[in-house]
């Protein structure tokens, strides 16, 4: 199963680590570079990078370039943990 992972808080990192430990097929990670909104903010890019998983920093997950990248990844499922914005139907 091809997994796209979306998150930017502590719980997001913990769950991503668990999926990596289980050798899940993670095809991409979407995270934020910074967040003043979340006190438990976590940048998932270093974890993705150290495990050779493609990643993207986004401000607006629903913008065209991000949707295009998601389509290229062809995920079977999206795991979204700790993301403070709604995903539009084009992503789902």
PLM feature spans:
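One-carbon transfer enzymes
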Residues: 1-92
């Amino acid at each position: 199963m091809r997994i796209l992972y979306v998150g930017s808080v502590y719980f997001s990192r913990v769950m991503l680590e668990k999926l990596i430990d289980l050798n899940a097929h993670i095809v991409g990670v979407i995270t934020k570079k910074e967040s003043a909104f979340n006190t438990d903010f976590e940048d998932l890019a270093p974890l993705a990078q150290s495990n050779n998983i493609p990643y993207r920093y986004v401000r607006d997950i629903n913008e065209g370039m991000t949707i295009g990248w998601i389509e290229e990844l062809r995920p079977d499922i999206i795991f979204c943990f700790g993301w403070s914005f709604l995903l539009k139907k084009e992503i789902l």
